[in-house]
């Protein structure tokens, strides 16, 4: 079995087992050798604290891509054991996130708020059809003519959109054309007509009586009075 070579310390480990490697890496000599290695590398590259930020540009990115260890840690370039070994037990959150929001009617209303309705209306609580967008004929110029929905009573799905609206329309029609009220109004109109006819007949009778009195006065003779005289033209003069 080949021995493990430490490039920082420039030595071969006597015990190349994982336990021996871990003990060497955590040792004080290895840490000091590693610090000295990077100091020498920065000195060779001419990197100082003054130009360190400028070094982090494209040159640093290219050096990172040139390093095989850093290239393996780039997004989408995970090693095979990381793709299939280390991540097989971690599922993506978005694939199962909908499970946290689906109650399926198993929990009470007080505990889960708006997620407490049954699964029958969970995915689509409001089933809107093409007829629900327009205004009904009874509300074309009404209060709710400019709104998206026809009225607040029409916001129920599953074929029950316009039950309340139809009920309101029917009630309005019943109020406008009530047979009892129509019959009462008809009776009032008939009574008024009878009263008008009877009053007209009385007026005609009164006119007839006046005509009879006038004819009788025309055919009557001269009128005589104790204090006055009548001339030939039926003119009556009264002495003062």
From Swiss-Prot:
Residues 178-194, 203-219 have a biased composition (Basic and acidic residues). Keywords: Metal-binding, Nucleus, Ribonucleoprotein, RNA-binding, Zinc, Zinc-finger. GO terms for molecular function: mRNA binding; pre-mRNA 5'-splice site binding; U1 snRNA binding; zinc ion binding. SUPFAM superfamilies: beta-beta-alpha zinc fingers. One of its GO terms (cellular component) is U1 snRNP. It is found in: Nucleus. It holds the Pfam family zf-U1. It comes from the Eukaryota. GO terms for biological process: mRNA 5'-splice site recognition; spliceosomal snRNP assembly. SMART domains: ZnF_U1 (SM00451). A zinc finger (Matrin-type) spans 4-36. Residues 226-240 have a biased composition (Polar residues). Disulfide bonds: none annotated. Residues 86-122, 175-240 are annotated as: Disordered. The keyword Ribonucleoprotein applies. Component of the spliceosomal U1 snRNP, which is essential for recognition of the pre-mRNA 5' splice-site and the subsequent assembly of the spliceosome. U1-C is directly involved in initial 5' splice-site recognition for both constitutive and regulated alternative splicing. The interaction with the 5' splice-site seems to precede base-pairing between the pre-mRNA and the U1 snRNA. Stimulates commitment or early (E) complex formation by stabilizing the base pairing of the 5' end of the U1 snRNA and the 5' splice-site region. U1 snRNP is composed of the 7 core Sm proteins B/B', D1, D2, D3, E, F and G that assemble in a heptameric protein ring on the Sm site of the small nuclear RNA to form the core snRNP, and at least 3 U1 snRNP-specific proteins U1-70K, U1-A and U1-C. U1-C interacts with U1 snRNA and the 5' splice-site region of the pre-mRNA. Belongs to the U1 small nuclear ribonucleoprotein C family. This is U1 small nuclear ribonucleoprotein C. It comes from Plasmodium vivax (strain Salvador I).
């Amino acid at each position: 079995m080949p021995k493990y070579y430490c490039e920082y310390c420039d030595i071969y480990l006597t015990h190349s087992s994982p336990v021996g490697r871990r003990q060497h890496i955590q040792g004080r000599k290895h840490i000091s050798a590693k610090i000295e290695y990077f100091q020498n590398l920065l000195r060779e590259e001419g990197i100082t604290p003054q130009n360190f930020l400028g070094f982090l540009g494209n040159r640093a990115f290219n050096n990172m891509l040139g390093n095989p260890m850093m290239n393996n840690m780039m997004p989408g370039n995970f090693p095979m054991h990381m793709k299939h070994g280390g991540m097989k037990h971690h599922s993506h959150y978005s694939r199962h996130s909908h499970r946290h929001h689906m109650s399926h009617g198993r929990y009470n209303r007080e505990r889960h708020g708006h997620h407490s309705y049954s699964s029958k209306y969970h995915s689509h609580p409001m089933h809107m059809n093409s007829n629900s967008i327009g205004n009904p004929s009874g509300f074309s110029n009404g209060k709710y003519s400019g709104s998206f929905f026809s009225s607040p009573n029409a916001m129920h799905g599953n074929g029950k959109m316009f039950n309340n609206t139809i009920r309101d329309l029917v009630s309005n029609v019943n109020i406008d054309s009530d047979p009892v009220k129509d019959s009462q109004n008809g009776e009032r109109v008939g009574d008024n007509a009878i009263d008008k006819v009877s009053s007209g007949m009385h007026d005609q009778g009164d006119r007839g009586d006046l005509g009879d009195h006038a004819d009788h006065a025309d055919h009557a003779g001269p009128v005589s009075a104790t204090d006055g005289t009548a001339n030939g033209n039926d003119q009556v003069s009264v002495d003062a």
